[in-house]
């Protein structure tokens, strides 16, 4: 539960930024509020961005652009998303809780918060996505994921180059709608591979050694083993570190094999 003292609907991004800068410690940018309601918090000023048109999915200037207020369910249903990258973005979110939840949860909420359990950030990393911030401008998602959360900025959109790359996503869950125990995503463009692993349970990261194995033709199994050895894995209520390490080898191998099959088609 959370308590809000002042709830505002800015009409422009400039107004939203000005409101946020008044007090970045107690002001909060609202998304779908799916995760915010899980804790207990007093919010001095809640800034609702729903009137700013950030819920659009566009293809322009050679990029697929996902507004920060785009819902996860839109990723499953929008033709511009489902027809690209072998539908990886719709696939990666399809097991998250249920459709009513995915109709509320947003791209911005998942990406900006850098949740370790986020299926979406894992998939986006494999697609070489970038984020666009109001103050910080455009930067690679990998760089954004590695940085501390800055509550004085606003995420506007996520951009993915519409380059026709093939992609695949794999995850293991204790139940169908649970958070992932581990997740892996792989993409390939002109023989160059990108591999990412999420829910370690830390934030999703790129795995360069696994990508190198695929680039050098060492095969999917070698890539999986490289991912298991390069990255660190932790223990939480869903799984132990050793189990996650074993899962990484399997899921990276499976995603790589799936992507290889797609490349043959």
Predicted region positions:
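C-terminal structural segment of proteins
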Residues: 1-265
